[in-house]
Amino acid sequence: MANESNKTVKVRLVRGLRGAQSRHRLSVRALGLNKLNDVRELKDSPQVRGLINTVHYLVKVEE
């Protein structure tokens, strides 16, 4: 169980936000991504996975 809580996900913003829906822009900001090619290492949780699924076409995920 302790190993599961330490899992992280790397998320990279690979497409610009111009033309994206405002809700999707907010989801990208919530992930901590600001500029193109920004990378964040986030804790793997259902909340983070939901945000990633919302903007799957804007980001690239590395396990």
Curated annotation (Swiss-Prot):
Gene3D superfamilies: Ribosomal protein L30, ferredoxin-like fold domain. SUPFAM superfamilies: Ribosomal protein L30p/L7e. It comes from the Bacteria. Transmembrane segments: none annotated. InterPro entries: Ribo_uL30_ferredoxin-like_sf (IPR036919), Ribosomal_uL30_bac-type (IPR005996), Ribosomal_uL30_ferredoxin-like (IPR016082). GO terms for biological process: translation. The keyword Ribosomal protein applies. One of its GO terms (cellular component) is cytosolic large ribosomal subunit. Part of the 50S ribosomal subunit. NCBIfam families: rpmD_bact (TIGR01308). This is Large ribosomal subunit protein uL30. The gene is rpmD.
